[in-house]
Amino acid sequence: GLFVRSYSIVPVVRVLYFLFALTMILKTLITFRFCHETKQGKIRRAETRGISVFHMLGEYRQLIPGMLKNRGVLKAVAVSVILYVTNMVSTNFFGLYVTQRLGLSENFLALFPILNAAVMLIFMIGLQHRINATKFRIPLWIGLALYVVAALVLIFSPADRLGFVLLYVFIAAMAAALVNPRKDVLLQLNITSQERARLNALIMASTVALSSPFGYLAGWLSSMDRRLPFVFTLLLFVTAMFVIGRIQEPQVEER
């Protein structure tokens, strides 16, 4: 926000893109230098040596029916889609809501992601290891309940009151620290290690495809009332709580 006011948005965005490109190059170099192929990856490379890419793509036809028959995977995908949609709505419409309806200055928009990241970091470092001893579903329920509370705080926030928006960001960050790691674990516990890479690719593609129509729906709701997209996310969080309630407590094998 400070740089935009001083130099305008175009040069600032150019610098951001340059920094992003630089960090991705560094990440790629570090990955190739210090990371190694997994055991299953080595097995898969040996199995597919000499096989064409088109033949390997055709093998997905055998994976899709198996994925659709696995209720655990379908429930995990449902939770993943719901959280993907709610994150998409929050990312795209939060700025519009707090500036156009709540009347906050655009200069505050840069503050909220910093606060969100700081709260998540403190929560994960200070409290996450203590929560890991509890049952798997309970932290997920608590996180989703916090998301519901955060949505209610934002929906009923009075205009020109920064404190309510900061409270929303704080609660949502705690919820994300509880939900996001366990959402990913939930997917991994329901797929076999032999097909993990291909199933993860299918699940990611399915998540993006299934969530795409909801972006249009959220935009339509926002055009009627800036609060409606967040009412929609509230309903999705309640739905996710119901889905989690239908999932059997995962059993993690100790080694």
Model-based region annotation:
Residues 1-14, 211-229:
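Transmembrane alpha-helix termini and helix-breaking/packing motifs in multi-pass membrane transporters
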Residues 92-109:
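Short amphipathic helix-loop junctions that connect adjacent transmembrane helices
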Residues 28-47, 245-255:
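Helix-loop junctions on the cytosolic side of multi-pass membrane transporters
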Residues 36-77:
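Juxtamembrane intracellular "pre-TM" segments in multi-pass secondary transporters
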Residues 138-153:
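Structural signature of the two symmetry-related core transmembrane helices
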Residues 4-5, 123-136, 222:
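Helix-to-loop junctions at the C-terminal end of transmembrane segments
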Residues 109-131:
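Transmembrane alpha-helices of Major Facilitator/SLC transporters
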Residues 178-191:
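Intracellular juxtamembrane helix-capping segments at the cytosolic ends
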